[in-house]
Structure formats: C-alpha cells, structure tokens
Amino acid sequence: MNVKPSLDELFERRINFPDFEPQERLARLVGLDEHKDRLSKILGLLVNPYGIQEWAKKYHPDARAAVDTVLRRPPLVVLAGDVGSGKTELAETIGDAVARQEDIDITLYPLSLATRGQGRVGEMTQLVSAAFDYTIEAADKLKNTNGKARGAVLLLIDEADALAQSRENAQMHHEDRAGVNAFIRGIDRIANQKLPAAVLMCTNRLKALDPAVQRRAAEILTFSRPNDEQRHYLLHSKLTGLGLNSTAVEELVRLTGPRDPNSPGFTFSDITQRLIPSIILAAYPYNAVSVHSALQVVNKMTPTPAFIDRQ
C-alpha cells in the first residue's frame, strides 16, 4: 500500500520570500534582466490578480475584457533551454522579486529530485498529486476573494521533462502517462479554484513536453547561452578589481564564444562556476591575477557540450 509522502519528504527545502539571500542570488544573475522582468510580471499576475485589476482601474477602467484575457491564463510558466543557462537559479530566486513587487509573502516549494520515485506502480502519479495537494492546501489558506492575496505559493519542478514527457511517445510507460495526467489535473485545479499559486517548470527538453502541458503554459521562456554582449557584461562585472584591462576582457569575451561554427560558446555557469574561479586559483596564493595567466586558463577550458533537444 502506498503512503502519501510527507511535506518534508516532497519539499526538502522550502524557501520564503522576501529574503536577503535569494535577493543576492538573483542579483548575481547578470545578463538575464529581460527574463527577470518578464517572469516577475507574469508570476505577479498569476499569484496576485488584484494588482492588475487595480492598475486597470487607474489607467484603463473600460478595459475589463482585455484584463480578463490576461487573468485567464493558466498558472504555469515553462523555463526551457540549454544546461547552465541560468533557468533553475532564476526559478529558485525570482520569488523574491515577485514578493517585493506585489508586497506579499511567497513560499517556494521546490520538488526534490529524490522524489522522482523508484518506478513502483502508481508512485509517480502519487508524487505529482501529493505535490499539488500540498501546494493547493497552502494556497487556499492565502486566498482572498475581496482583494490582494494574503500570500502566495510557487511550485518549482526542475528537470520537468522527467515528469511531463509527451503522452504521444510510443515508448512511454503507462505509469508515466498517468503522471502526466496528474500534472495536468493539478494545473487545472489551481486555475479553477483561482488560487494565489503558480507552477514553474524547468526543462532542457522543451520538445519532450506533452503538448497539453505546453498549451497550459501562460508563458514559455527560452534560455540560450550568453551572446557577446552578455558575456562582456558578465566578465566585466565579475572581473572588475583584478587588474584586467578592457583589451584583456574583450579577448576573454572572444575566447568564451563559439570557437568554430559547430561548437557552442560557454554557458553562464561555465563562466561563473568554472572560468572565473579558475582564473583566481591560478594566481592564488602567491601571485596577482595577470592577463597572461587568465588567457592561459580560458584557452585550456572547454565549454559544456550542448544539450540536444529531442522528443
């Protein structure tokens, strides 16, 4: 007999917003300002429709039909893109921006990778259903039918393609299909009850997501590797103070881009988690960082291979 997992088993580390730590993490995500702005607005509308209603009263009092169209969008946002593109870090921290923007407290429920299950019959369906049960239970207590929500809940499912593969896939197990159906039902439950909650899905494999899941997305934000301008901003902002001149930074920008037509450039995480620490460690503890040593480091480093998105 299957036992419903506890709240702590499903969500090992719930995060409350606003808070300084996620605010700082969000600020460190340079080069993604457009995605930050877009996602915070979308989630703000989903978890606190009162905000846009007040905006409409002030600026467009006769635009009820247009506003209703915006508010009827399903409470799901998909963040899709290559590995190391910043989508998971953004999903884990954007709640802080939304909480400050809407002036409400928000709790993030990140679905633990350890809860994917061991393949027992009915387990995936049970896990997905339980995740939505806890999300809906918490959001229902925060609902306010007469004004601004008293708070909100964000359910984050990382590596979402593991939960929501296309039911059209001939190799898909019956149990997986049932898990997808449970996910779709969960999205519909939040929408139908008009709860202050939204679901964030992160995936490397957008094409693998079930069409019904994609149709329920209020927005699909795509993430790619940083272009020249983004890499320049990232490298310049992170390396300021190390004595590297503009010519050296430009050379680092070039070397972290595609080195031939068939090769990808560096990801955001390649630069922030591998390259910059390696530049510092190459000099530490007896030497200052030099242009020569920095260029040596980047020349020896290869970017993370591109993820091939297949159905």
From Swiss-Prot:
Result of changing residue 159 to Q: Stabilizes a 1:1:6 CdnC:Cap7:Cap6 complex, probably prevents ATP hydrolysis. Still confers phage immunity
Pfam families associated with the record: AAA (PF00004)
UniProt key word ATP-binding: yes
Keyword Nucleotide-binding: yes
Effect of residue 87 to A: Partially inhibits second messenger synthesis by CdnC:Cap7:DNA complex
Residue sites binding ATP per the record: 84-89, 215-216
Record GO terms (molecular function): ATP binding; ATP hydrolysis activity
Organism domain of life: Bacteria
InterPro entries given in the database record: AAA+_ATPase, ATPase_AAA_core, MT-severing_AAA_ATPase, P-loop_NTPase
Keywords carried by this UniProt record: Antiviral defense, ATP-binding, Nucleotide-binding
Single GO BP term: defense response to virus
UniProt-listed PANTHER family: AAA DOMAIN-CONTAINING, VACUOLAR PROTEIN SORTING-ASSOCIATED PROTEIN 4A
Function according to Swiss-Prot or TrEMBL: Regulates complex assembly in a CBASS antivirus system. CBASS (cyclic oligonucleotide-based antiphage signaling system) provides immunity against bacteriophage. The CD-NTase protein synthesizes cyclic nucleotides in response to infection; these serve as specific second messenger signals. The signals activate a diverse range of effectors, leading to bacterial cell death and thus abortive phage infection. A type III-C(AAA) CBASS system. Binds and disassembles an active CdnC:Cap7 (Cap7 is also called HORMA) complex, inhibiting the complex's ability to synthesize cyclic nucleotide second messengers. An AAA+-ATPase remodeler, in the absence of foreign threat Cap6 (also called Trip13) probably maintains the Cap7 protein in its open, inactive state. Once activated (presumably by a bacteriophage protein) Cap7 binds to and activates its cognate CD-NTase (CdnC in this bacteria) to synthesize cAAA, a cyclic nucleotide second messenger.
Subunit structure: Homohexamer. Forms a 1:1:6 CdnC:Cap7:Cap6 complex.
Family per record: Belongs to the AAA ATPase family.
Comment field on protein domains: In the disassembly complex (PDB:6P8V) Cap6 (this protein) crystallizes as a right-handed spiral; the top 4 subunits bind ATP while the bottom 2 do not. A CdnC monomer lies along the surface of the hexamer at the interface of subunits 5 and 6, with Cap7 (also called HORMA) at its tip, over the central hexamer pore. The N-terminus of Cap7 extends into the pore, contacting 5/6 Cap6 subunits.
Protein name, entry field: CD-NTase-associated protein 6
Organism field: Escherichia coli (strain MS 115-1)
